[in-house]
Curated annotation (Swiss-Prot):
Induction: By amino acid starvation. It has a GCN4-dependent and a GCN4-independent (basal) expression.
Protein name: Imidazole glycerol phosphate synthase hisHF
Active site per database record: C83 (for gatase activity), H193 (for gatase activity), E195 (for gatase activity), D245, D404
Residues that coordinate or bind L-glutamine: C83
GO molecular function per UniProt: glutaminase activity; imidazoleglycerol-phosphate synthase activity; lyase activity
Domain of life: Eukaryota
Region described as PRFAR binding: spans on this chain: 364-365, 402-404, 474-475, 500-501, 523-524
Organism taxonomic ancestry: Eukaryota, Fungi, Dikarya, Ascomycota, Saccharomycotina
Effect on the protein of changing R239 to A/H/K: 1000-fold decrease in catalytic efficiency. Uncoupling of glutaminase activity from the cyclase activity
Keywords assigned by UniProt, alphabetized: Amino-acid biosynthesis, Glutamine amidotransferase, Histidine biosynthesis, Hydrolase, Lyase, Multifunctional enzyme, Stress response
Catalytic activity, reaction form: 5-[(5-phospho-1-deoxy-D-ribulos-1-ylimino)methylamino]-1-(5-phospho-beta-D-ribosyl)imidazole-4-carboxamide + L-glutamine = D-erythro-1-(imidazol-4-yl)glycerol 3-phosphate + 5-amino-1-(5-phospho-beta-D-ribosyl)imidazole-4-carboxamide + L-glutamate + H(+); L-glutamine + H2O = L-glutamate + NH4(+)
Name of the gene: HIS7
Hydrolase in keyword set: yes
Amino-acid positions noted as binding substrate in the UniProt annotation, renumbered to this chain: G332, N469
Length: 552
């Protein structure tokens, strides 16, 4: 079995890349230090990276990898950079002004303009059609991008790069064109994550490993019309996420369940925990149905076992073997005391999840505590919250804030310190205003903190995405809370995932057309088999919304 070498500087989720390469029939050998790096014994090298530019390139240099990487490139053997692995080829980035890259490409990365679109870019974009695409990049396929900083192009920069021998695959986010992939001689790199881009991404990895550039398939005019990017949503497809609430039932089995206003027990039948299936099998099923992401919310956090034996780690490891789209895990991402009394910081907990196959971690209760502290300190963090420590190491895009709010009616802004708005749906006593109160501990405890205040604080502390639940809508199958979504979109510039209330495909369309939701999440309607993820996507496609279709 041919061997692929992967440089490991402990930057994010290498498990998924390893799984993708093994899925393609290759063996993976991780290169953890320069002394493990034998150029003559290496035929394919991959440099993956996630998170903060400076954190990654400084790590690369401090561990002594610069010289062997340069010698390997000089040898003419194939190398592939992924995400920050692509960015490391550049001179530097405004994200980390004091850090220097490998400087194979002489210009600096810059941040996307967030005045016109959410930043980070999180979602499925495409390469702009060109005659010079390479390694099977297909302008009618979608690839998974997750980044705030990019090699943003203008005509002069593009011309200079091409004059220097670089082939460029461009993508466009909002009005900004940037480098999606580059190729020169033996160097190939992608800004997107091919290991998280479904079958389309696996094809790109396979083409690199086989050093082949097959032609773009012959699509019919009708197929091109359906699949081509119309840039109606900044260039991204409408993202559909399948969510699995995981907990142990009364028999000790790990099951996927679903609440009704956060109550996961049956109304009859002895009040047992609703069992809607096994998490790994369901995740695989939703991936096959076309889910753009799968989220595991570990709703009991498995408090009675050592962290390293947490069942969720095994769930992630198994799911990541066959689910080649992003995986998010939530529950228990905080500073903990292990069963043996050892104190384990949130960053270490998150790192364990990332190494097991997670791409993002979701923080709930501790995000509320962090936001309260942020305001107590006069609108600043102190660097110790899980949001700050994890985003500093892995990047904002790795930190999702899971919010569990409920609607509170008031007569005017004077009734609360939290931001209110005038609602179309007056309260039981004719109240015209409302705010959304944050809860903790799975909705069991309310705090004097509004969703507006929470999300703004978390964005400032370094979070990259909001998973916006709604206790009032949970399990209702009556559609998302559209007012809540718009309220939070007014508050922050990071992407917002609409959650709670979806019962039919029309609810997804309604959220995408009537709000600025960046993604929509479904749970019960998928678990019960009433609709598949593909049913939702087909419906959206029929109604003129672009979605990712990942068929061979």
């Amino acid at each position: 079995m041919p061997v692929v070498h992967v440089i490991d500087v402990e930057s994010g989720n290498l498990q998924s890349l390893t799984n993708a390469i093994e899925h393609l029939g290759y063996e993976v050998q991780l290169v953890k230090s320069p002394k493990d790096f034998n150029i003559s014994g290496t035929s394919r090298l991959i440099l993956p990276g996630v998170g903060n530019y400076g954190h990654f390139v400084d790590n690369l240099f401090n561990r002594g990898f610069e010289k062997p990487i340069r010698e390997y490139i000089e040898s003419g053997k194939p190398i592939m950079g992924i995400c920050v692995g692509l960015q490391a080829l550049f001179a530097g980035s405004v994200e980390s002004p004091k850090s220097t890259g490998l400087n194979y490409i002489d210009f600096k990365l810059s941040r996307f303009d967030d005045s016109e679109k959410p930043v980070p870019e999180i979602g499925w974009n495409s390469c702009i059609p060109s005659e010079n695409l390479f390694f099977g990049l297909d302008p009618y396929k979608r690839y998974y991008f997750v980044h705030s900083f990019a090699a943003i192009l203008n005509s002069e920069k593009k011309k200079n790069l091409e004059n220097d021998g670089w082939k460029i695959a461009k993508a466009k986010y909002g009005s900004e064109e940037f480098i999606a992939a580059v190729n020169k001689n033996n160097i190939f790199a992608t800004q997107f994550h091919p290991e998280k881009s479904g079958k389309a991404g696996l094809n790109v990895i396979e083409n690199f490993l086989k050093q082949q550039s097959p032609p773009i398939p012959n699509y019919s005019a009708e197929e091109k019309e359906l699949l081509m990017n119309d840039y109606s949503n900044y260039g991204l497809t409408r993202r559909i996420i399948a969510c699995l609430d995981v907990r142990t039932n009364d028999q000790g089995d790990l099951v996927v369940t679903k609440g009704d206003q956060y109550d996961v027990r049956e109304k009859s039948d002895g009040k047992g925990v609703r069992n809607l299936g096994k998490p790994v099998q369901l995740a695989q099923k939703y991936y096959q149905q076309g889910a753009d992401e799968v989220t595991f919310l570990n709703i009991t956090s498995f408090r009675d076992c050592p962290l390293k034996d947490t069942p969720m780690l095994e769930v992630l490891k198994q799911a990541a073997k066959t689910v080649f789209v992003p995986l998010t895990v939530g529950g228990g991402i905080k500073d903990i005391v292990d069963v043996d009394g050892t104190k384990i910081p949130a960053l270490e907990v998150a790192s364990l999840y990332f190494r097991s196959g997670a791409d993002k971690v979701s923080i709930g209760t501790d995000a509320v505590y962090a936001a309260e502290k942020y305001y107590e300190l006069g609108n600043r963090g102190d660097g110790t919250s899980p949001i700050e420590t994890i985003s500093k190491a892995y990047g904002a895009q790795a930190v999702v804030i899971s919010v569990d709010p409920k609607r509170v009616y008031v007569n005017s802004q004077a009734d609360t310190k939290n931001k209110v708005f005038e609602t179309e749906y007056p309260g039981p006593n004719g109240e015209k205003y409302c705010w959304y109160q944050c809860t903790i501990k799975g909705g069991r405890e309310s705090r004097d903190l509004g969703v507006w205040e929470l999300t703004r604080a978390c964005e400032a502390l370094g979070a990259g995405e909001i998973l916006l639940n709604c206790i009032d809508k949970d399990g209702s199958n009556s559609g998302y809370d559209l007012e809540l979504i718009e309220h939070v979109k007014d508050a922050v510039k990071i992407p917002v995932i609409a959650s709670s209330g979806a019962g039919v495909p029309e609810h997804f369309e309604e959220a995408f057309l009537k709000t600025r939701a960046d993604a929509c999440l479904g749970a019960g309607m998928f678990h019960r088999g009433e609709f598949t993820v593909n049913d939702v996507k087909e419906y959206l496609l029929e109604h003129g919304l672009k979605v990712r279709m990942d068929e061979e």
